[in-house]
């Protein structure tokens, strides 16, 4: 997207739309994401309530960001009508925002519902995964790969009806043709399929991700776990599934058989979504037992869910605090590397520029970096590609941003985050139902009942759960260039 006069002037949607304020009145904030905010809104003509996702155009830096938003809207329209996919009502644009109006899901997140209910069994997990894999099958049958399935992306329309579960976020979804191979690394670390990390994948990756969700639903923890993001990736590529630790000795063989079929490392041998739905463990009146699972499963599920929520809040704080000045700093860096002022960085310019910033990367690593950043495969990196490749990675873990996020929670400046301060932050972020004791318990390594800065940083670096890992697998640009 051209930056003439700022991208606010361009039509992201390709045409002028009616003003959203003529049709809807915007209400209170429901949530915050990397690119914008979701509000409650009311249709003026009918009084019906909807959710409105307002995307900040200022943050759509590259052409790819704009295409992602357009594609998300197209895919939501394309999938409209499937009962477990959120219904889009319309999309609108003004000089500052793109607004997507959709069905309101006020019943809360999937994990929260499981935890609140208390009684939980394999049968209940089977009912839930049947809905999730049903969404995958619907997407695949219509030529859509989701690419970012995770529990947070499933909400209940009504908190008393588990069958009202809806998939809500299609921001990373793409259209695919049979046999088409994808290379960009996207998704969330705990859920990513091995072939995605190897940059050679298709729709089978969605079934792997659903298999990870099923493992968590039954045991309370993810199957591939480590202290760092790289450690998680290594575990995913190794593919060893733990069926020995508690609660697995008490879990049915049929459940384990299904998980093995979904978490098969070879995509060609993995179950399809259709095969999963026909598995005896999942079928109606199937073999999934209805006896209560060990209470420790719910307890672990609470801790895993709670830690992710704290991390998401911290990432929002960081994303919102990125200033025009910081983007300007990256602009200067781009200019310094673009020595011939052509508006694009060649391989040689990138290599020379990284050397100036103290990098010791090998040529092959610089080539990988170049490929990851070169979105349009032109052989060079233009300004938009450079900003997109660097802003989403380096900003999240830079020391000053982690410190400012920590200070956001540490309201009294004591050097510790307490349960009261977390409560205050949750209220500010509209996340009042988070299980705060479990957040503290999970993150607090020295068991003093509060979170210090070291514990906070360790949590943030344990598998970032942001909206996308796009390009973050090429960690070296952050370590060698931008942290200077």
Swiss-Prot record:
Q: Which reaction does it catalyse?
A: L-seryl-[protein] + ATP = O-phospho-L-seryl-[protein] + ADP + H(+); L-threonyl-[protein] + ATP = O-phospho-L-threonyl-[protein] + ADP + H(+)
**Span list, region Autoinhibitory domain:** 288-318
**Annotated residues for binding of Ca(2+) 2:** 374, 376, 378, 380, 385
Show the active-site residues: 148
Which positions in this protein are listed as binding ATP? 30-38, 53
Instruction: Describe the task this protein carries out.
Output: May play a role in signal transduction pathways that involve calcium as a second messenger.
Q: Family assignment?
A: Belongs to the protein kinase superfamily. Ser/Thr protein kinase family. CDPK subfamily.
UniProt name for this protein: Calcium-dependent protein kinase 26
**What's the source species for this entry?**
Arabidopsis thaliana
